[in-house]
Amino acid sequence: MRDELLNTPTDPLEEKFEEQIRPSRLEDFSGQQRLTDNLRIFIAAARQRGEALDHVLFSGPPGLGKTTLAHIIASELGGGLKITSGPLLDKPGNLAGLLTSLQKGDVLFIDEIHRLTPAVEEYLYSAMEDFRIDILLDSGPSARSVQLRLEPFTLVGATTRAGLLTSPLRARFGISNRLDYYSAELLQRIIIRTATILGIAIDQQAADEIARRSRGTPRIANRLLKRARDFTQVAQSSVISLELARKTLAALEIDEDGLDDMDKKIILSLLQKFDGGPVGISSLAVSVGEEHDTIEEVYEPYLIQTGFIARTPRGRVATKNAYRKFLGVLPGDDGPLFQKGSS
């Protein structure tokens, strides 16, 4: 369920939904206040100088707005936007075709930039630093290199795994920002904004309930809103009420902390199969039947943020919060945490 709620949309209808609700200006972007305030200054200064904006790196968990910010940057700069991802750029030739198609002031957005191959990454260095690339013509003894000048452009890179970026690539980004999880209050505002755009009536309490269970992530909040709309429509109601919101969340097995079935499997595996840890990520992944990359990128950041698991040099461990919520005991206790007569 979490992958479904977090994945970047590929279905045409889902893409249309994302485009419909996506803000096009920084002033309409909710959250990440310091980041957007700084970007506003950097963009204005670059436009006044008539220069390309320095290359921008966004890092952080999925669903927080990295792609949306790339769209906004292109819009604010008045340039075009080309979108690709690290896994798609498997050969330097693929990157060269993209780079040579860019016009002055355009933005190139590379999602999952940490997944670039070393050959493609090295090819990107001269493009980022000097706006040029070297094309190899022919092969063997007759091979020769031709240098092509590129129009000044801005590269926006996005990653959920900043630690996997090489130092040379990271150093070439003049602007680097990490996106943080959103507060429930901000998510509530986003839900109400999306509902207004889509023509959905929703109670304030219902919006708050969905916001609190959205894992601090706008993409999840918006998709849960869509599911609540479905339940409301089938119930032949004109308004998403608190009762219908809770019914939706219960059907999706999302609890009051925003945890879904896989989150619970991860925590219970830590507690029951590994005695609370520490345990390596590969062993934990095998125990729950999930890829370790997915656990690291999708599930683990929120579980750490909310204090249910912790990372140590020896592996992942369950926290007191996990013991309390799932077992009703604290580490080392012999009995239930809440017994009769306890104060």
Swiss-Prot record:
DNA binds at R311, R316. One of its GO terms (molecular function) is ATP binding. The keyword ATP-binding applies. GO terms for cellular component: cytoplasm; Holliday junction resolvase complex. It is an enzyme of class 3 (hydrolase). SMART domains: AAA. It catalyses: ATP + H2O = ADP + phosphate + H(+). Residues 1-182 are annotated as: Large ATPase domain (RuvB-L). Mg(2+) binds at T67. Pfam families: AAA_lid_4, RuvB_C, RuvB_N. Signal peptide: none annotated. Keywords: ATP-binding, Cytoplasm, DNA damage, DNA recombination, DNA repair, DNA-binding, Hydrolase, Nucleotide-binding. Its main location: cytoplasm. Residues 256-343 are annotated as: Head domain (RuvB-H). Gene3D superfamilies: 1.10.8.60, P-loop containing nucleotide triphosphate hydrolases, Winged helix-like DNA-binding domain superfamily/Winged helix DNA-binding domain. InterPro entries: AAA+_ATPase, AAA_lid_4, DNA_helicase_Holl-junc_RuvB, P-loop_NTPase, RuvB-like_N, RuvB_C, WH-like_DNA-bd_sf, WH_DNA-bd_sf. Homohexamer. Forms an RuvA(8)-RuvB(12)-Holliday junction (HJ) complex. HJ DNA is sandwiched between 2 RuvA tetramers; dsDNA enters through RuvA and exits via RuvB. An RuvB hexamer assembles on each DNA strand where it exits the tetramer. Each RuvB hexamer is contacted by two RuvA subunits (via domain III) on 2 adjacent RuvB subunits; this complex drives branch migration. In the full resolvosome a probable DNA-RuvA(4)-RuvB(12)-RuvC(2) complex forms which resolves the HJ. The RuvA-RuvB-RuvC complex processes Holliday junction (HJ) DNA during genetic recombination and DNA repair, while the RuvA-RuvB complex plays an important role in the rescue of blocked DNA replication forks via replication fork reversal (RFR). RuvA specifically binds to HJ cruciform DNA, conferring on it an open structure. The RuvB hexamer acts as an ATP-dependent pump, pulling dsDNA into and through the RuvAB complex. RuvB forms 2 homohexamers on either side of HJ DNA bound by 1 or 2 RuvA tetramers; 4 subunits per hexamer contact DNA at a time. NCBIfam families: PRK00080.1, ruvB. Has 3 domains, the large (RuvB-L) and small ATPase (RuvB-S) domains and the C-terminal head (RuvB-H) domain. The head domain binds DNA, while the ATPase domains jointly bind ATP, ADP or are empty depending on the state of the subunit in the translocation cycle. During a single DNA translocation step the structure of each domain remains the same, but their relative positions change. This is Holliday junction branch migration complex subunit RuvB. It comes from Prosthecochloris aestuarii (strain DSM 271 / SK 413).
